[in-house]
Amino acid sequence: MNSIPNQNKALIQPLRAALYDIDPTALHDQLAAVFADDAMIRLAFPFEDVDGPSDLHERVYRPLLDAMPDLERRDYIVMAGAVDDRHWVGCAGYYMGVFERAWLDIPPTGHLVGMRYHEFFRIEAGQIVEMQALWDIPEVMMQAGAYPMAPSLGVEWRVPAPASQDGILTAPYDADHANASLALVSAMLTGLTRSREGHDKMELSRFWHPKMNWYGPAGIGSMRRVSGFRNWHQIPFLKAMPDRRGLPENRNLFGDGDYVGFTAWPGMDVTLTGDGWLGLPPVNRKLTMRSLDFWRCENGRIRENWVLVDLLDVYHQLGIDVFQRMRELTHMRQPNFSGEPL
């Protein structure tokens, strides 16, 4: 008998196919077929909450298709699992296409662009009843020469698929294997909560492979080895927000084979009391964060970690209008440019 995780991966396969070879009418019909009419759809800023599959098509996908008429979606991770009675499918990959017309006022390039995504779908009774998804919109801004915020401490590049090339899991679900991966990542996350006791108390080298890669969002960047993770992300992050706290009531953490996925909306609250992260000043402002993650385990260690954070939402909570700053930076490339300052 086919397991529920495999059934759920099969359920979204037609949607994945419709997003690979996109026909707008077929996509609309497929969204209507697989999503419940009252599905809770939560997307990255500036989209935020979307009112069902029709709104998802008209307000989100149609403008993106207008900007990139040859749009396609490529998965490199597809996994599934359950948290209590909540059954999830998690997908990671990137949208790509020729950027022909402006999108969210990001000026077009006429060239191929890519945008990472992490998308999680909760399934009940054969329908998607909830979607939590982050699209790396700052990555598109960067490719258009239009990102107006501080440069990344990590490296900006095309984040790769898993080194093992096995991220689209189709084998029969193995609960023991999934639980072993889940236990490793859970222990690592517990270790991170001891950061105030000192670096050694987190036991990073116990959990992470010596050649680990951490693939952060555009605006933070990617890094290799524990030392790179510490220098280019963790130390600035913890210095700026030492009180960061997970929100277990929102947490969905599940395993499938060597992979573990995490989604929460939001997953963390913090207070920005220190300097050094994203070039932001210590404004003593409370924030929530949306971070959607995937990990790949290898021989008892974590070898790769894909991370997307809704940085545009962080800036929005701080009263920073990234899109307006982008329009100022690119006003001569905006469609309504008149020669006058904005």
Feature-to-residue mapping (PLM):
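C-terminal and inter-domain tail/linker signature
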Residues: M1-L342
